C-alpha cells in the first residue's frame, strides 16, 4: 500500500461510491436491502453495515435468508426499521436454498403490497 500511494477502504464503501449510492438515496423514502444472514456480526463489517451508515435516517427494510438472535433486538441495535426473513418456521434450509429466487420474489411482493397499502394516503 505504501509503495503505490494506495488507500485501504472497506469493500462496501468502494462499491457504494462506484454506484453513486449517496446520490441515489438522496430523495428516498425507504431503502430495501438484503443480507444472507443477519446476526451480531453485522456490526463488525458485513456489507449491510455500510448501507445502514449511509442511510441518514431513511427507514431500512432488510430482507435476509437467516436470522440469528432476537429479531427486535437486532433491528434496534443495527438501526434497521424491519428485518424480514425469507425462511418460514419449519422451512428446511435445503428447500430455501433451492428455491431462493422464488422465495425472494414472493417476499418482495409482500413488502411492496405492504408499502402500497400503508402509503395509499401519503
Predicted regions and their residues:
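N-terminal loops that bind phosphate or other acidic moieties
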Residues: 1-122
Amino acid at each position: 500500500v505504501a509503495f503505490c500511494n494506495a488507500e485501504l477502504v472497506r469493500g462496501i464503501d468502494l462499491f457504494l461510491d462506484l454506484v453513486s449510492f449517496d446520490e441515489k438515496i438522496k430523495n428516498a423514502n425507504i431503502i430495501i436491502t438484503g443480507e444472507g444472514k443477519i446476526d451480531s456480526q453485522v456490526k463488525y463489517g458485513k456489507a449491510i453495515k455500510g448501507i445502514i451508515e449511509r442511510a441518514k435516517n431513511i427507514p431500512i427494510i432488510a430482507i435476509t435468508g437467516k436470522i440469528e438472535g432476537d429479531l427486535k433486538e437486532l433491528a434496534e441495535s443495527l438501526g434497521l426499521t424491519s428485518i424480514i426473513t425469507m425462511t418460514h418456521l419449519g422451512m428446511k434450509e435445503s428447500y430455501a436454498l433451492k428455491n431462493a429466487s422464488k422465495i425472494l420474489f414472493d417476499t418482495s411482493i409482500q413488502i411492496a403490497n405492504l408499502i402500497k397499502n400503508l402509503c395509499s394516503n401519503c
